[in-house]
Amino acid sequence: ARPKSDCEKHRESTEKTGTIMKLIPKCKENSDYEELQCYEDSKFCVCYDKKGHAASPISTKVKECGCYLKQKERKDSGRESAIIPQCEEDGKWAKKQLWEFNKSCWCVDEKGEQVGKIHHDCDSLKCE
């Protein structure tokens, strides 16, 4: 048998604890952490990256993780000029994205892909 992954070890140790509200990690077949992790008997969820680090706030509103994971990846890159995605509380991409570094903005679709052109008058940009 192959050695247990960090996710599987984390899952086993959590299952043994007697905490009232606990998050028992869900692991993918490839041993990475599932992106959306939810607490037992509760509506609270959180996004994890594949190594098991939180990528979003713990919230009853978090439903998807694509934006939060991209946001964490960019923040962790340490690049000052990195474009940090803006996410809605539920984890969806905010329709209007802003790049502070050069004060530009644009609209995105539900996958975070740019729609239309880049603008510099961000107050007047309306994204539907």
From Swiss-Prot:
Location relative to the cell? Secreted
A Gene Ontology biological process in which this protein takes part is:
cell-matrix adhesion
| Reported tissue expression | Expressed by the venom gland.
Q: List the disulfide bonds.
A: C7-C27, C38-C45, C47-C67, C107-C127
The entry's keywords: Disulfide bond, Protease inhibitor, Repeat, Secreted, Thiol protease inhibitor
Domain called Thyroglobulin type-1: residue spans: 4-67, 72-127
- Where is it found, in Gene Ontology cellular component terms? basement membrane; extracellular space
Q: Which GO terms describe its molecular function?
A: cysteine-type endopeptidase inhibitor activity
PROSITE patterns named among the record's database cross-references: THYROGLOBULIN_1_2
User: Zinc-finger among the record's keywords?
Assistant: no
Q: Does the keyword Secreted apply?
A: yes
Which function does this protein serve? Answer: Cysteine proteinase inhibitor.
Which PANTHER family does this UniProt record tie to the protein?
A: NIDOGEN-2, SECRETED MODULAR CALCIUM-BINDING PROTEIN
Entry protein name: U24-ctenitoxin-Pn1a
